[in-house]
């Protein structure tokens, strides 16, 4: 009877330890995912003509559809900045794609580490 009791306690302790490890791993995954997203949000900023802009799909769409070659936009510091639309559009597209590619690669690494 004593051996059975010790055996049950050992199994329960092992299961609890495994459960704690799984919870920690899930928490680490969510934390790492959030930190990565915050990093990428910072990486989405691009300097242009003494201004700093956050590149978003909305900004890219705006630049792609605006009819004039010169446009004035408010930067992240709330300053009006003159932009050469096509030049800035190309810069934004390249910068956005680089940031999204980096995010995708790093996110896959986090997912892979979670499954190990």
Residue ranges, per PLM feature:
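A preference for well-ordered globular domain cores
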Residues: 2-116
């Amino acid at each position: 009877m004593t051996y059975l009791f010790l055996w049950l306690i050992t199994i329960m302790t092992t299961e609890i330890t495994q459960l704690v490890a799984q919870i920690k791993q899930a928490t680490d995954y969510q934390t790492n995912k959030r930190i990565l997203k915050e990093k990428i949000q910072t990486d989405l900023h691009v300097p242009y003509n003494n201004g700093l802009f956050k590149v978003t799909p909305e900004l890219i769409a705006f630049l792609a559809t605006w009819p004039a070659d010169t446009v004035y936009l408010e930067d992240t510091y709330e300053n009006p900045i003159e932009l050469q639309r096509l030049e800035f559009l190309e810069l934004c597209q390249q910068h956005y794609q680089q940031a999204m590619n980096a995010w995708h690669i790093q996110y896959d690494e986090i997912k892979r580490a979670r499954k190990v």
